[in-house]
């Protein structure tokens, strides 16, 4: 959404009803979302004809589908409304709630867990495919550990991202990285968010 600058221009009711009745492959999913949208609109006093979002019916800063809006959106600033459409504070709190929930990860976000660690292959030109989102990759003995963190002993989700320039620099991601991808299923998105968060820590003294 370009940090909330573009949240979509399609009426959510149009997007969901079109997909629910004219898209057989995902009909069950979108019929459920249409029902959730009507329930959400009643609960939050929305005008169903005015709410706009993405082509798939996702809404607001966080681009939540209606079911996740109902289950996971928070009134983070405690003003009496769960507003991820226009309220950045509510949106940020709601995304954090998503990551900590079963939707984000079967075990939820681990507050003290790492997201991704830099690692260097012990041999040059090592051929390793990214294991992102697939089976845990447990051959970590081929890497040098370049951080103060220990590589995890039990792998929930391990992802390897070769550096495009050096080819022998890797990032090893654990289940917190995987949780980010449950919000957006792009490995590049997840790594971008992680690296941006690290820069924010530096500049804001977090």
Predicted feature residues:
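Short, functionally critical alpha-helical segments immediately adjacent to catalytic or ligand/cofactor-binding
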Residues: 1-4, 37-42, 95-97
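Secretory-pathway/luminal and periplasmic proteins that interact with or process carbohydrate-rich
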Residues: 1-11, 21-27, 43-49, 63, ...
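Second-shell loop/turn segments in exported
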Residues: 2, 18-28, 51-58, 77-86, ...
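Extracytoplasmic/secreted proteins, especially bacterial periplasmic and envelope-associated proteins
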Residues: 11, 15, 29-36, 60, ...
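Generic structural signal for hydrophobic core residues of well-folded globular domains
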Residues: 19-20, 41, 72, 99-102, ...
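Catalytic cores of secreted/periplasmic lytic hydrolases that degrade extracellular macromolecules
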Residues: 29, 33, 43, 55
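Flexible, glycine-rich surface segments
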Residues: 48, 55-165
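C-terminal functional modules
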Residues: 146, 153-206
